């Protein structure tokens, strides 16, 4: 059981079981995976960038961003390393555009993606939220929910407000949906499921079990709740920073999504044998996808916390999101080689 392992043991296990090796035989997208961040609107362009940039710096082979039309050029200007698709529209968009055609473009891209992040910089425009609902439905119906979803920010707002979305998430395979609420969003989720627990941990487990998902509650310690049992909860108390910057949660979604893409390469696609990672056949594998996903979330939390610690050490109160986000690559290398 993962909850019985120490921090060092969990990180070592993630390195051995979740992260595929880089081998000459692998083609582009096979080892590092393909991740898509869905978010970004006229008012919020930084959040999807920080999530996508963290994913890319983690080693993702191909990182896409699907955003609202007005956010596209801005996000593209930040870096040439991301593929940015301005396919979403807000309700007040005056462009003459065929939304069915835009939906086809989105679905065509999703068919090639291994992990989807929903929410960074999304906003709460009704047409944007409807597009997200359509995406959640499409992945469930076309791909049987096998493409993991990492849902944050206004994606969580949609979950709390739309009962049909909640029902769809319940139909995804266990552990294929990861929710990453902060303390306020966690309370909203508690209210949305209409259940009460005797303790904070029990409430986290109730949310995870009710929605058939993994819940990563961000806080002084990050708590990762399993859809299986309260006993399976993981707690990450590694040192971070005393300053919280906007965008730290976006860095976390990027780190988690890339770890999930790595885990899919190992668990779903089985791209290499144990011997290719230098492992013994006597090594016990993780039991199932939920174990891989829980461990991926733990690793993502560790990376984000260490980036935050280093950023704060270097800049103190002046630390900005870029000061931690740009450290993702070096921290990943330090932890996992």
UniProtKB/Swiss-Prot annotation:
Pfam families (UniProt xref): Carb_kinase
Signal peptide region: none
Alphabetized UniProt keyword annotations: ATP-binding, Cytoplasm, Lyase, NAD, NADP, Nucleotide-binding, Phosphoprotein
Annotated EC: 4.2.1.93
Modified-residue entries (Phosphoserine), positions: 6
Binding residues annotated for (6S)-NADPHX, in chain numbering: 121, 182-188, 250
Ligand binding (ATP): 218-222, 240-249
GO terms for biological process, alphabetical: metabolite repair; nicotinamide nucleotide metabolic process
Top-rank lineage group of the source organism: Eukaryota
Catalytic activity: (6S)-NADHX + ATP = ADP + phosphate + NADH + H(+); (6S)-NADPHX + ATP = ADP + phosphate + NADPH + H(+)
Entry similarity comment: Belongs to the NnrD/CARKD family.
Further details from the record: Present with 3870 molecules/cell in log phase SD medium.
Protein name: ATP-dependent (S)-NAD(P)H-hydrate dehydratase
Encoding gene, per UniProt annotation: NNR2
């Amino acid at each position: 059981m993962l909850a019985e392992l120490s921090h060092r043991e969990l990180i070592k296990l993630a390195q051995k079981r979740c992260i595929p090796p880089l081998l000459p035989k692998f083609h582009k997208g096979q080892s590092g995976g393909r991740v898509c961040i869905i978010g970004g609107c006229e008012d919020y362009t930084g959040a999807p960038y920080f999530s996508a940039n963290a994913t890319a710096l983690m080693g993702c082979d191909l990182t896409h961003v699907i955003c609202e039309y007005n956010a596209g050029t801005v996000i593209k200007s930040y870096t040439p390393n991301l593929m940015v698709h301005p396919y979403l529209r807000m309700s007040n968009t005056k462009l003459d555009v065929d939304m069915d055609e835009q939906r086809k473009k989105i679905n065509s891209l999703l068919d090639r993606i291994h992990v989807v992040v929903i929410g960074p910089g999304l906003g709460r425009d009704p047409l944007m939220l409807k597009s997200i609902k359509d995406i959640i439905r499409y992945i469930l119906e076309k791909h049987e929910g096998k493409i993991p979803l990492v849902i944050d920010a206004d994606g969580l707002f949609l979950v709390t407000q739309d009962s049909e979305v909640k029902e769809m998430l319940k139909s995804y395979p266990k552990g294929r949906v990861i929710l990453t609420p902060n303390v306020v969003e966690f309370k909203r989720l508690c209210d949305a499921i209409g259940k009460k627990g005797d303790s904070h941990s029990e409430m986290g487990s109730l949310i995870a079990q009710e929605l058939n998902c993994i819940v990563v509650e961000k806080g002084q310690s990050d708590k990762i709740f399993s859809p299986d049992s309260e006993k399976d909860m993981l707690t990450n108390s590694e040192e971070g920073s005393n300053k919280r910057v906007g965008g730290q949660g976006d860095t976390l979604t990027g780190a988690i999504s890339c770890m999930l893409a790595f885990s899919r390469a190992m668990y779903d696609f089985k791209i290499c044998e144990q011997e290719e990672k230098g492992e013994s056949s006597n090594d016990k594998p993780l039991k199932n996808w939920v174990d891989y996903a829980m461990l991926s979330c733990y690793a993502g939390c560790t990376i984000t916390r260490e980036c935050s610690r280093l950023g704060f050490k270097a800049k103190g109160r002046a630390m900005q999101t870029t000061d931690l986000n740009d450290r993702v690559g070096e921290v990943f290398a330090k932890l996992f080689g």
